[in-house]
Amino acid sequence: MKKIFFLLFISLPLVSFSQEWGTVNRNNVTMKEVAPTWPGCESKGSADACFRQMLAQHIGKNFRYPAEAYKNNEQGKVIVEFMITESGTVDIKNISGGTTALQEEAKRNIMLIPKMAKPGMLAGKPKAIKYTVPFNFTTGK
């Protein structure tokens, strides 16, 4: 019995010293949003770059200066804030700047954006992603 207590008494400090002291650093996890996939960009390498390129082409192709606003020399910068929703559709959140006619044209242009082939993603789940697009209306007169 004395031998058991003696072995236990000797091994106790070994257990105590075998534990390491240290600090646990926080793990920082950064999750990157993945842009929605514009129709036709499914096979492209970078969905984000393709989305930006297709959005710029869409805006340029569908841009129209409202005739009455042009005639009245209405100019200004209109900023449209919108979301591409989890279902891949456009949801306008805010329109500011410019005149009412210029705002309506900017809204019309953005609402013509097609439904995305895939929505934006965050951590592997569909995520609504916010975009802000400026429209500069100048008549050059």
Residues of each region from the PLM?
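Charge-biased low-complexity segments
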Residues: 5-7, 17-141
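N-terminal signal peptide c-region/cleavage motif recognized by signal peptidases
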Residues: 11-15
